[in-house]
Structure formats: C-alpha cells, structure tokens
C-alpha cells in the first residue's frame, strides 16, 4: 500500500467524519483520479516535439499517455480537425497515490518563487486544477536531456460535493495552499 493511502485511511477519514458529521465512511470524499495534460501547439510544425512531450509525460507519470487530437479546425491557430495537439494521462489506483505523494513532498517544494497554491482553482464540485510551467521540477526529468521547457495541467478529481469539502480533503494531506 502507498504511504499516502494508509494516511488517508487512518487519519484523513476520521478527521473529515468529525468535521462534516458524515453518517458513513462511504460519504467521505476521496481522490478519484489525477489527470496530467500537456498541450503542445508547436507539434503541428514539428512532429518530434510531440514525441519528446510523450517521453517526458511517460517518465513523470510512469504510464504511457494518449495523444489528444483536435476536435475541430481553427484557422487562427493553424489547426485542422484530427491533428495531434497534445497528450494526457489519467492516474488511478496506486499510481494516483504515488504521484500525489510525489507532487506534495517533492515537486511543489521545487517550484521557483513558490508562495502557495491558489484556493480559487476549485471548479465548484471540489475538483482542483493547477498548472505547472516547467517539467524540470520533476525528479525524473534530466535537465541536460530536454529539448525545451514545457508546462502541464494537473487536475485532481474528487467525489466531494462542494469546494469546501474538496479543500478540506486536500488540506488534510498538507496540500500547500496560500495563507
């Protein structure tokens, strides 16, 4: 079992039951999945850029990403329907817990000029999204071997009913929100 999963079972669930007076353990919010998305607009010019992004996302997540394809043509972006425009990976189960542990303990503290994550990034249903500007903050990425710095979006999907429940869930894991 993952260290963070055991922490969730032993500490987070009892604390949230006490705070929100849930009648059942099954009513306690939990993290359902973590989605990592890398949008690469330059991939229409050079196909190698997409391969490098897939390689980076594979190293970061430990899972092979799928290529996202444009749903419709947009002339101003020079995109046609069916063009590859990025890649994404969805983490569930043990990989989800391992990645979340790595995100909290290693990756977020390595962000330059970090002052805490915004509390406004919840979507109204307790899901949290954050953007990372450079992939080199992940320990799996070798700084000397990257072709360019790319960012990514990370979405933490929970089954909580409100932003308050989602925020309390992430706060129990010591997620670094702004004061």
Curated annotation (Swiss-Prot):
This protein's GO CC annotations: ribonucleoprotein complex; ribosome
Keyword set, alphabetical order: Ribonucleoprotein, Ribosomal protein, RNA-binding, rRNA-binding, tRNA-binding
Family the UniProt entry places it in: Belongs to the universal ribosomal protein uL5 family.
PANTHER family: 60S RIBOSOMAL PROTEIN L11-RELATED
Keyword Ubl conjugation (UniProt): no
Subunit structure: Part of the 50S ribosomal subunit; part of the 5S rRNA/L5/L18/L25 subcomplex. Contacts the 5S rRNA and the P site tRNA. Forms a bridge to the 30S subunit in the 70S ribosome.
Family matches, as InterPro entries: Ribosomal_uL5 (IPR002132), Ribosomal_uL5_bac-type (IPR020930), Ribosomal_uL5_C (IPR031309), Ribosomal_uL5_CS (IPR020929), Ribosomal_uL5_dom_sf (IPR022803), Ribosomal_uL5_N (IPR031310)
Protein name as annotated: Large ribosomal subunit protein uL5
UniProt xrefs under HAMAP family: Ribosomal_uL5_B (MF_01333_B)
SUPFAM superfamilies: RL5-like
Function: This is one of the proteins that bind and probably mediate the attachment of the 5S RNA into the large ribosomal subunit, where it forms part of the central protuberance. In the 70S ribosome it contacts protein S13 of the 30S subunit (bridge B1b), connecting the 2 subunits; this bridge is implicated in subunit movement. Contacts the P site tRNA; the 5S rRNA and some of its associated proteins might help stabilize positioning of ribosome-bound tRNAs.
BP terms from Gene Ontology: translation
GO molecular function, one term: rRNA binding
